[in-house]
């Protein structure tokens, strides 16, 4: 995924929420995405852990 991609994010206890990627930071353990959400327009960071399906919080929408 890259900046300006439309995504959905997994949050605790609710449905996936739509957003837009504002920034991407790569790490050896996975990737951090700064995602703008309706109630967080300046963005909130989410981490996608490499190699663990349960650690995937950001997914690109079609």
Swiss-Prot record:
Coiled coil ranges: none
Pfam families, per the entry: DSRB
Signal peptide positions on this chain: none
InterPro entries: Dextransucrase_DSRB
Alphabetized HAMAP family for the sequence: DsrB
Family to which this protein belongs: Belongs to the DsrB family.
UniProt name for this protein: Protein DsrB
Source organism of this protein record: Citrobacter koseri (strain ATCC BAA-895 / CDC 4225-83 / SGSC4696)
């Amino acid at each position: 995924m890259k900046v300006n991609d439309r995504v959905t994010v997994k949050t605790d206890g609710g449905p996936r929420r739509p957003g837009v990627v504002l920034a991407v930071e790569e790490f050896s353990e996975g990737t951090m995405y700064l995602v703008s959400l309706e109630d967080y327009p300046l963005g909130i960071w989410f981490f996608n852990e490499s190699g663990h399906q349960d650690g995937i919080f950001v997914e690109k929408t079609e």
